[in-house]
């Protein structure tokens, strides 16, 4: 009888261990999914912000080309644009991407930095009329 009781205790302990392992595995999987979802949402928000910032940049450029705003108004807007763009790019550093996506995030950040540099060169051209700045801006934009 003692042998059967010990055997039942061992079986119960193994069953509890198996159930505990399954629960821990499922919990770990859920946490990983939640972190991945959060990362995806944060990355999507950054990309959306960059798209909005660039849309406004080109909208103001068009207004200036069409004569709807002055050069001074354009440059004032571009000063704000540059600050917003830099702030948004810095948010890439706050991301905690899964290892699989680290290189992709790095490439997205480099792309945004290149776009910012293109914008800075364009602004330099607007300020000074230096055609080489315009050419650099166009070259960076094509990258």
Positions of PLM-derived features:
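Serine/threonine-rich low-complexity intrinsically disordered regions
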Residues: 1-5, 30, 70, 130
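Alpha-helical segments in soluble extracytoplasmic regions
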Residues: 38-143
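Juxtamembrane loop-transmembrane helix junctions in multi-pass integral membrane proteins
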Residues: 2, 32-35, 97-100
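Short, well-ordered helical secondary-structure segments
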Residues: 12, 26, 30, 79-84
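Ser/Thr/Pro/Gly-rich low-complexity linker/stalk segments immediately outside membranes or between
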Residues: 25-45
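N-terminal Sec-pathway targeting helices
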Residues: 1-18, 22-26
